[in-house]
Curated annotation (Swiss-Prot):
Membrane topology note: Multi-pass membrane protein
Ranges facing Extracellular side: 66-84, 119-128, 165-173, 199-216, 235-241, 266-274
Predominant localisation class: membrane
GO biological process, one term: lipid catabolic process
Protein name: Phospholipase A1
Binding site for Ca(2+) 1: S126
One Pfam family hit: PLA1
Species, as recorded: Salmonella typhi
Annotated transmembrane regions: 53-65, 85-99, 106-118, 129-148, 151-164, 174-186, 189-198, 217-223, 226-234, 242-250, 256-265, 275-286
Quaternary context: Homodimer; dimerization is reversible, and the dimeric form is the active one.
Gene Ontology cellular-component annotations: cell outer membrane
Length: 289
């Protein structure tokens, strides 16, 4: 299985580069592509009806963490030999199911985001994947241009989110949420807020909102060709949260050099209640702009 995954990773990420930057597109529904707008991008119609669109960022980085949550994976026969250095990568794609479902600037869409932490250098234990989070979504999105105090609201999105690590007990972690995502931009600034409401069972992680809160805030700043980004979640009642800061810069037309720092709780589902600081550097195919 690991050999298959190693082969699939480059085969999956490389074709995505073709869609990471602006392509020759045909404007539809009077909603031209807008920098940083997921929904306006999905309203663009390519010649290929099976085109996949970036949803979140797509990257691959080599990382090292201040501490490793060995207790959470103690049932794995290799847990004591787990290493602090890992390859972390994220694949995030979206597909429009129905453009114009509720008007010319609306779309019914689906997305899939996968984030993995791979013990690549741990050859002694056959380089296992310590954790992988699978996050499919179904959503209704609107591209807008409402203006207020210099800001333009670009995306309004409402949907259902499932997030799971695909494990069985005792390492199973999952939760389901209804969410709203709002994205606005002002010049070189982008701000996105995504509040959510947890539904269904959280028996695997009953206190997850204690550490992950009820919303995510994302901020981006376009500095020349570089993009500085920050996102995080915080529970004001408990004082727990986590934040990620990233900086990317283009090195070719389709590839960006990317540096990332994550600090706090909730970097992954298995680490939702574990505090750490992780630093990584690698490549990215598309940033939030």
């Amino acid at each position: 299985m690991r050999a298959i995954l190693r082969g699939l990773l480059p085969a999956t990420l490389l074709p995505l580069a073709a869609y990471a930057q602006e392509a020759t597109i045909k404007e539809v529904h009077d909603a031209p592509a807008v920098r940083g707008s997921i929904i306006a991008n999905m309203l663009q119609e390519h010649d290929n009806p099976f085109t996949l669109y970036p949803y979140d960022t797509n990257y691959l980085i080599y990382t090292n963490t201040s501490d490793l949550n060995k207790e959470a994976i103690s049932t794995y026969n290799w847990s004591e030999n787990a290493r602090k250095d890992e390859v972390k990568f994220q694949l995030s794609l979206a597909f429009p199911l129905w453009r114009g479902i509720l008007g010319p600037n609306s779309v019914l869409g689906a997305s899939y985001t996968q984030k993995s932490w791979w013990q690549l250098s741990n050859s002694k234990e056959s380089s296992p994947f310590r954790e992988t989070n699978y996050e499919p979504q179904l959503f209704l999105g609107f591209a807008t241009d409402y203006r207020f105090a210099g800001w333009t609201l670009r995306d309004v999105e409402m949907g259902y989110n499932h997030d799971s690590n695909g494990r069985s007990d005792p390492t199973s972690r999952s939760w389901n949420r209804l969410y709203t995502r709002l994205m606005a931009e002002n010049g070189n600034w982008l701000v996105e807020v995504k509040p959510w409401y947890v539904i269904g069972s959280t028996d695997d992680n009953p206190d997850i909102t204690k550490y992950m809160g009820y919303y995510q805030l994302k901020i981006g700043y376009h500095l020349g060709e570089a993009v500085l980004s920050a996102k995080g979640q915080y529970n004001w009642n408990t004082g727990y949260g986590g934040a990620e800061v990233g900086l990317s810069y283009p090195v070719t037309k389709h590839v960006r050099l990317y540096t990332q720092v994550y600090s706090g709780y909730g970097e992954s589902l298995i680490d939702y209640n574990f505090n750490q600081t992780r630093v990584g550097v690698g490549v990215m195919l598309n940033d939030i702009f």
